Amino acid sequence: MKTSEVKFFEAVKLFNEDFYWDAIEAFQDSLSDGLEDRYVDDCFLNIAVCYMSLKLFNEAEVYFLRAIDAGSTSGDQIDFEGPIFGKTSDRAYLGLARIALVKKEFADATNILEKLKGTESYIEINGEKISMYDICNEEVTRVKDILSK
C-alpha cells in the first residue's frame, strides 16, 4: 500500500474519532503525497464534512465543490460506505444544499435539490433505503416551514 493511501486511511480513522482538524491535515497530506485518483473525490468530501462538523461552512463549500469536480474527472463511481450507497457527487450536493439552508439561500438549495432528482444514491435508515433526493427535499421543506412561521 502506498504512503498516500496509508495516510488516507489514517485520516479516515481520525475522522471517525471526531478529530476533525487532525483528519483535515491527514487528508491533505495524503493528497500531497499523490493519492490515487479513485480516492481523491472521497478525500475532498471527507475534508468538506470535517469543515461542516466544525461549522466552517465556507470552507466546507469549497471542498464539496472540489469533490464534485474530482468525481467528474475520476468517473464518480458508486461507493458503499456503511449505510450510505451512492456517488460522492450526490453526497457533496446534499452537503451543498445543507450549507445553502444554513445561509438561508433557499433558491440555491432548491436548485441543488433538482440535481439530486433521479439519483440512485441513498442512505439506509432502520432498514429503509431513503434517497438523497428525499432527504434533501425533506430538509429544504422543513427549514422553509420553520422560517415561514
Question: Which positions does each model-derived feature cover?
Answer:
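Residue signature of alpha-solenoid helical repeat architecture, marking inter-repeat boundaries
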Residues: 1-2, 38, 87
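Alpha-helical segment of the N-proximal tetratricopeptide repeat
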Residues: 3-32
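"A position-specific structural signal for the A-helix of alpha-solenoid helical repeats
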Residues: 9, 46, 88-91, 95, ...
